[in-house]
């Protein structure tokens, strides 16, 4: 099996290090193409106004080959698939992200966007996140992925689909729930401050608010109950029900 790994926390992050070691135990070829620094919440941005630079990044142990890129997570996967790897991978895995990627967070997430870039290029992908901010246990997420990925050999993913996986920090084998994306927004988003010259500036902060707390089918509900959430996502954002209504009254030809 050939696996390409990326992330948005950067190549030096603990999460991607634990994921690399886990993937080396189940794949004969492992490649890591990751940003040179943290690029959290950069979405699906790509670099078009300057050249990208790729440097070989050797690891102290294991058989993985690595490159560090001065670009976004989507840049990393795009460059890896189109220019760095001699042969396409069987799977792209993005993570292990520091913190959850639940609900509409996937629209901001560089981790999930790296996985989306893979399926744009016809490679199945998984985005995996550790749903915690402190006392991080990346090993529990890495162990889960080591057991989960081999199951895909018997049950291949569909064309143009990725799996968004969120793993509780205290996961104890309670189980997996197949979920949908919940609705999530942030309140008290900006911390307003004044600099020594009297000019106003803002730090983005914010507290997450789940808008579907009464729905047990959401990813956030599953994680809050101690389950691993697995949410299938695809590229097609079309609202087909409204498409029919729109075609019914617009003067289309």
From Swiss-Prot:
A divalent metal cation binds at residues 8-9, 40, 97. GO terms for cellular component: cytoplasm. It is found in: Cytoplasm. GO terms for molecular function: 3'-nucleotidase activity; 5'-nucleotidase activity; exopolyphosphatase activity; metal ion binding; nucleotide binding. Binds 1 divalent metal cation per subunit. HAMAP family: SurE. It catalyses: a ribonucleoside 5'-phosphate + H2O = a ribonucleoside + phosphate. Keywords: Cytoplasm, Hydrolase, Metal-binding, Nucleotide-binding. InterPro entries: SurE, SurE-like_Pase/nucleotidase, SurE-like_sf. Coiled coil: none annotated. Nucleotidase that shows phosphatase activity on nucleoside 5'-monophosphates. Its main location: cytoplasm. Its cofactor is a divalent metal cation. Belongs to the SurE nucleotidase family. Its EC number is 3.1.3.5. It comes from the Bacteria. This is 5'-nucleotidase SurE.
């Amino acid at each position: 099996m050939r696996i390409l790994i990326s992330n948005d926390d950067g190549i030096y992050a603990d999460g991607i290090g634990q994921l690399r070691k886990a993937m080396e135990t189940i794949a004969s070829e492992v490649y890591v193409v990751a940003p040179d620094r943290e690029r959290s919440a950069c979405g699906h941005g790509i670099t078009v106004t300057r050249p990208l630079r790729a440097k070989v990044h050797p690891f102290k142990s294991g058989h993985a080959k690595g490159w560090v890129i001065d670009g976004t997570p989507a840049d990393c996967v795009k460059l890896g698939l189109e220019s760095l790897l001699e042969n396409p991978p069987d799977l792209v895995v993005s993570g292990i992200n520091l913190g959850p990627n639940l609900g509409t967070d996937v629209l901001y997430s560089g981790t999930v966007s790296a996985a989306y870039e893979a399926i744009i290029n016809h490679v199945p992908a998984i985005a995996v996140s550790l749903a915690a901010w402190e006392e991080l246990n990346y090993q529990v997420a890495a162990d889960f992925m080591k057991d989960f990925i081999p199951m895909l050999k018997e049950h291949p993913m569909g064309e143009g689909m990725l799996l968004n996986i969120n793993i509780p920090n205290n996961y104890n084998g309670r189980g997996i729930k197949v979920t949908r994306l919940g609705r999530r927004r942030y309140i008290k988003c900006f911390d307003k401050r004044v600099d020594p010259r009297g000019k106003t500036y803002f730090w983005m902060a914010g507290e997450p608010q789940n808008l579907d707390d009464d729905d047990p089918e959401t990813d956030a509900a599953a994680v809050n109950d101690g389950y691993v959430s697995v949410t299938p996502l695809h590229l097609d954002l079309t609202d087909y029900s409204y498409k029919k209504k729109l075609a019914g009254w617009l003067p289309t030809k």
